[in-house]
Every structure is written in C-alpha cells, then in structure tokens.
C-alpha cells in the first residue's frame, strides 16, 4: 500500500530527499496543514471566545484520541502542555519531600537528564541512575532497584531514545506505586503511536507523558500527561487553567481540580491540538491503526537490517545494531547502529540528501508511512557508498 499521497505537501517540498528520520522530526501529513488553517480561522473568527471552543471541543476531542490510543479508562486524566519539560516540573513539584529521591536510568532524554542534574547540584534531588548497558539485564536490574525501595519517584522510558531498547516491565513498577510514594513516571515519547500501548491495567498507578512531535505526526506543542487519581493532588508549579472545573483544597488556600486537570498550566498555542485532531481523523478515515503502521515500518526495517547484515549497505555492516528486528515483538520505530564513524556517515548521507540522525556514536534510521519499499532500496544504494 502506498501512503505517500497522505504526505504530498511535505514530500513535494523536496521530492528527491530520502527522509529516514521519522523518529526525530516526523514529516507532517496533509491533514495537519488543514488543522493548522482551521486553528487560524477559528482563532480569528471567535477571537476572545476561542477558549470556550478550545476547552469545549478541541481539547475534549484530543483527550478522547489519546485515551482511546492508550486504553485509558477516562479522558479526564489527561492534560496538554507545550513540552514534556513543563510536565516534568509540575509532577516533581507535587512531591511533598525534599530532597526528592529519584530512581532513573543513564539513558533518559535530555529534558530529564539536564533537569535532574541541576536538581542534584541545587540539593533538590538525589538521583540514582541504573545503567542501560548491558541492556540484556537492564530490565531485571532496574526492577530490582525499584523493589529495593527508598525512592519517591521512579522515572523510566518506554522506549529509549538513543538505543531504541524497549522496557516491558511497567506493570511490575505499577505494583510498587502509591500516592505516598513512590510515584512511577513513564516517558512514552518514543512509544506513543509507535507501538501499540495498552495502559488499562496500570492507569490508576502510573504517570505517562508523551507528545505529538514524532509518531503522532502533529509537530511541536502537543505534549500530554496522563495522571493517575490521588497521586500529586497539589503541584506547586501550577497554572490558572488548573482552576477550571470541580475544585478542592484547604479553606482559603489554592484550589485544584480533582482529575488530571490539577496538572494544567496556563495559556498555550492550541494549534498543535488542531493538527493532532486532524491527523487522527485522517488515520480513522483510512482505517490506519498504530499496529498497522508499526507493521509497515517493521517490514521496511527488516529489509534494511538484512541489507546491513548482508553487506549491501557499505560501512554500516561494521556497526552494531543495538535494537535488531526480532520477529513480531513490539519495538522502536527506528534502527540504532553504533559505530565510531556514525557522525561521519550521517554527514555523508546528508550530502546525498538522505536524512538520518546521530546521537554520539549511534546513527538512527526512522521508518514510517511516507516511505516505500523502493525508498528503502534507494537508502541501501546510498549507504553502499559509505566506507
């Protein structure tokens, strides 16, 4: 099946480009353009009244899409924010202990990595980081560290951004979660709409954050948080949007919503939610599910992996594939290859108008709907020129 017509605007801007960085900046489908135009039109048509429309229609629609994607029991557990860093600050501000004792890994995305390092410098947190390597034993080591206790907050990625490794022991962490501590926070940015994710059995125990920049195909500004009931009822970092709805709190004190809305911030650019809703409507119209998209990407990944292992992809055959395709198992939507020449390969490919990206000594190739089997063959041909 050829899905390129859904991305005609983005692909038409550079028809010769091979974009294999869908895990980084996913190209936007045509539907997102229509959503952006609608956001502009409604902002100017309704002006000051647009927020009634946004909170009355746009946000509930987006909440519904996320809730259905993750099998959440209620969309009311969800809020949106411009980025996950804001969400992280609000969650940690709700921990009523100092310094906050955090269990994490050495492979978290920069939003958490940098902020947690600064909290440590300021004496506001004590962070224990479990090494990802060797990844074959990581899950066992991390769960054991969590079960050992002594933490207020446990932070871990569903899919690790650099290596593409997948953590599949969330349910065991959820068993440890308690409103009195520890809290479990899952960074799902490389999992949401990349691989089917069902949170129905852990939704009352874990925080889950992700966004629209990658596999949701909606661009920046559409990050979200699922907050379990009773965890963090009064975040210190709070915006005035958290005042809307049913409120509770001490007499004369700051009042909070009792659902996920207690983590709302303040005024934000809602156009990202218009794009997200438009993209989800497009997927529904074409009967495309996350499982179907993941299967399409898996087939492309498998062919590229076979070419690497078979010596068809030039110097890439010298690299270690950190997250190889393994049957039908859930996986990242990118292949991560480690080699000292990764930065040089990325630059050489870019000169051929082939887009991948690199993290230190890891080059990543991301796959999605707008790529075809022919594109993968062209990618292999380009990589064959790498030494």
State what each model feature region is.
Residues 1-387:
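Pyridoxal 5′-phosphate
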């Amino acid at each position: 099946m050829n899905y390129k017509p859904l991305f005609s605007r983005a692909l038409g801007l550079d028809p010769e480009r091979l974009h294999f960085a869908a895990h980084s900046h996913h190209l936007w489908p045509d539907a997102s353009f229509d959503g952006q135009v609608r956001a502009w039109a409604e902002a100017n048509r309704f002006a000051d009244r647009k927020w009634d429309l946004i909170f009355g229609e746009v946000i509930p629609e987006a909440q519904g899409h996320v809730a259905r994607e993750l099998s959440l029991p209620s969309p009311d557990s969800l809020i949106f924010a411009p980025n996950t860093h804001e969400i992280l600050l609000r969650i940690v501000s709700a921990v009523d202990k100092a310094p906050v004792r955090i269990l994490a890994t050495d492979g978290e995305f920069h939003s958490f990595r940098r902020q947690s390092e600064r909290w440590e410098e300021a004496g506001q947190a004590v962070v224990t980081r479990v090494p990802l390597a060797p990844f074959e034993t990581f899950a066992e080591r991390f769960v054991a560290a969590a079960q050992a206790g002594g933490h207020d907050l446990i932070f871990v990625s569903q899919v690790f951004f650099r290596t593409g490794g997948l953590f599949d022991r969330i349910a065991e962490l959820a068993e440890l979660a308690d409103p009195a501590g520890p809290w479990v926070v899952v960074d799902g940015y490389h999992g949401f709409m990349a691989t089917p994710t069902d949170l129905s059995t852990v939704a009352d125990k874990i925080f889950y954050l992700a966004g629209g920049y990658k596999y949701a195909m909606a661009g920046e500004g559409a990050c979200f948080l699922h907050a379990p009931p009773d965890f963090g009822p009064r975040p210190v970092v709070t915006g005035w949007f958290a005042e809307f709805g049913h409120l509770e709190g001490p007499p004369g004190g700051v009042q909070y919503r009792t659902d996920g809305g207690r983590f709302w911030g303040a005024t934000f650019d809602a156009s990202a939610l218009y794009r997200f809703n438009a993209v989800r409507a497009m997927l529904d119209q074409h009967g495309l599910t996350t499982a179907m998209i993941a299967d399409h990407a898996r087939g492309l990944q498998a062919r590229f992996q076979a070419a690497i292992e078979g010596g068809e992809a030039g110097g890439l055959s010298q690299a270690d594939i950190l997250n190889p395709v393994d049957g039908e198992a859930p996986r990242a939507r990118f292949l991560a290859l480690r080699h000292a020449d990764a930065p040089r390969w990325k630059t050489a490919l870019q000169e051929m108008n082939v887009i991948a990206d690199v993290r230190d000594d890891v080059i990543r190739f991301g796959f999605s709907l707008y790529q075809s089997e022919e594109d993968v063959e062209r990618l292999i041909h380009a990589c064959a020129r790498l030494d």
